[in-house]
Amino acid sequence: MKSPTPALMLQGTSSNAGKSILTAAFCRILLQDGYRVAPFKAQNMALNSHVTADGLELGRAQAVQAAACRLDVDVRMNPVLLKPNSDTGSQVVVMGRPVGNMRVREYMAYKPVAFDAARAAYDSLAADVDVMVLEGAGSPAEVNLKAHDIVNMAMARHAEAKVLLVGDIDRGGVFASLVGTMELLDPWERDLVAGFVLNKFRGDATLLSPAYDVVTGRTGKPFLGVVPWLHDLGLPDEDSVSFRETLAGRAPDVPAGGGMLDIVLVDLPHISNFTDLDALRREPDVAVRVVRSPEQLGSPDAIILPGSKNTLGDLAALRSRGMAEALCALRSAEGGHLGPVIVGICGGFQMMGRFLADPQGVESDHACTEAGLGLLPVTTEMGSAKVLRRTSAKTVSGWCGAGVAAGLMPGTGGGHGGAEVCPGEGYAVHGYEIHHGVTTPDAGGGAVLVCLHESDGSPAGWTTPDGQVWGTYLHGVFDADGFRRGWLDALRVRRGLEPVGRVVARYDLDPALDRLADVVREAVDMGHIYSVLGLSPKGRRQT
């Protein structure tokens, strides 16, 4: 009988302990050391998702981990994806395709089917590589959930994986969490744990030695590393908790006389694919902040309405907070000054239209039609069919996503040192679509122009003639370095600032993954980890 593929698994004492990032780190380390490696997470609950080349959906974290392995994204890496669309239910996606919306008890009954799919996907993927790196979810010691576990110890047992238990030391109480987790595990589960890794440490690691002795004495498990707090890593956040925490300390406004652009993301209860903002956050002249109320808006240069897993519900939330009224008030120029550019992506794009129709009850209990924000003269009709595809598009000649600012004509760079902010040939953009519904211009409902188009001429984005409002279904539209800088420079000119005129921040995950791997390699005992896996370094590849 063939031996199972060696497997390492990252589990945590809590959510947001850093399992996804550390999984990516070990994927890149193993790749650097000469192994064919692939990531795997049996079940992911997330609103950040990605689309494979063949139009299948999986968690965004596994797409980043695939990049760490320098592999194309494969749906087998995340066979079960849960996308919460209410407080008690989720859309269930199995092997990249939605199988229905389920409440908690419905999904519990469905879990044996989901676990069968997960095991089959794992076995197939593991047969293609030298070593697997698995990620768990939450904590393996949730005693009320263990009977239905398919993502932590049950998956580790199937894979015969060696488990590293990760604790977030920055939150405090990590040693109690490690001991408590081990106490709540069954004996067979404890046997799978190879050791502990502390994550997000700030300070002198030598001061931790007394705690190691106590915890190892109680559990019999060694500490295999202390990973430092990683600043400005340049990789997408795992979930909305970490994303909101990252931006929580931003200043409420950026002084009008400063050189920084103030870009606001409107927070939504069911926000999805907020990774659309990651590339903007890397720009040196941009401050991105999250707002939840009209009082926090200030006077930004741009406002972004992000994706949503429950567009109708989040639109109602905007109204109840007063945000809908505030956004509409900012649509018009006041006092002779240009108002902020307002951008909608996916669900945010749908909200910006005049109407949202849901005749099949995709997002509601019954057929309904709701008024949108009325910022774009378009209407969306929800449908049960889910659009999942990668898309390449190009900006319409001379359009740069911020209107034509005073003193700057498209494609001329007039009066601003010759910097070409809106090129005549247009910018190439690439991304993916994940949505229910079709959006079309209203017949006779006001002027709206195509601003992005695919190679066959199909519209991929719409804008008002003045360029102040535009929307697209394209997740990742700001990942394109040229378009992103052109848009930001147009915002700068709109504010009376000099355009930068060149790409200064390249959105490339590969160097960030190498930096991550270097830090983690230095922080953990790779010799011990290779030993428990029955492997040895083959000699590092050139990166």
Curated annotation (Swiss-Prot):
UniProtKB keywords: Cobalamin biosynthesis, Glutamine amidotransferase
Endpoints of the signal sequence: none
InterPro entries documented for this protein: Class_I_gatase-like, CobQ/CobB/MinD/ParA_Nub-bd_dom, CobQ_GATase1, CobQ_N, CobQ_synth, GATase_3, P-loop_NTPase
GO biological process: cobalamin biosynthetic process
Keyword Coiled coil applies: no
Protein name: Cobyric acid synthase
Family: Belongs to the CobB/CobQ family. CobQ subfamily.
Pathway as given in its UniProt record: Cofactor biosynthesis; adenosylcobalamin biosynthesis
Record's function text: Catalyzes amidations at positions B, D, E, and G on adenosylcobyrinic A,C-diamide. NH(2) groups are provided by glutamine, and one molecule of ATP is hydrogenolyzed for each amidation.
Coiled-coil ranges (or none): none
Record GO terms (molecular function): ABC-type vitamin B12 transporter activity; catalytic activity
Keyword Lipid biosynthesis: no
A matching Pfam family: CbiA
Domain GATase cobBQ-type: 260-483
Catalytic machinery residues: C346, H475
